[in-house]
Amino acid sequence: MGIEEKLPSGFLLTTVEGLAGYVRKGSLWPASFGLACCAIEMMATAGGRFDIARFGMEAFRASPRQADLMIVAGRVSQKMAPVLRQIYDQMVEPKWVLAMGVCASSGGMFNNYAIVQGVDHIVPVDIYLPGCPPRPEMLLNAILTLHEKIQQMPLGVHRDEVARAAEQAALAATPTIQMKGLLR
């Protein structure tokens, strides 16, 4: 389909990878997965004061098939976890996940059976954004950090290897139910 399929493995010039990373980072299409108060701050980021359109993200996509960045904003319940994974699986490659807020990152103050203690138990997370709720400036900083990470991503079969290894490492976390004495 693209240049990464046409060229043999290992035969990519650094400038081509750099150019592809530059283009890719400037055209992220986010899918918002707003579940709590963090979603309000995410919507404020799209407003005129903070202007997320400067980074090529002016339209939040309603369909995961059109998005390559998922911003999980807020707490995820156990019933919502399969839906989150299904949306992640429907996104186009390459795809990235940003966990926005303490609830998405670690469950927040909701340490009970109904809330997933961090979305990294469901999908691999690329950037963790702390705060309750994080301000739009922090979200923009996290997006710029993600831009730097995207710029360094390789092309071709190497990209698939890196993505597969990152997903395996991210989902290898110990479930919090197995962590004894967490709040004692």
UniProtKB/Swiss-Prot annotation:
Binds 1 [4Fe-4S] cluster. It comes from the Bacteria. GO terms for biological process: aerobic respiration; electron transport coupled proton transport. It catalyses: a quinone + NADH + 5 H(+)(in) = a quinol + NAD(+) + 4 H(+)(out). It is an enzyme of class 7 (translocase). Its EC number is 7.1.1.-. It is found in: Cell membrane. The keyword Ribosomal protein does not apply. PROSITE patterns: COMPLEX1_20K (PS01150). Its cofactor is [4Fe-4S] cluster. Keywords: 4Fe-4S, Cell membrane, Iron, Iron-sulfur, Membrane, Metal-binding, NAD, Quinone, Translocase, Transport. Belongs to the complex I 20 kDa subunit family. NDH-1 is composed of 14 different subunits. Subunits NuoB, C, D, E, F, and G constitute the peripheral sector of the complex. This is NADH-quinone oxidoreductase subunit B. It comes from Rhodococcus opacus (strain B4). The lineage of its organism: Bacteria, Bacillati, Actinomycetota, Actinomycetes, Mycobacteriales.
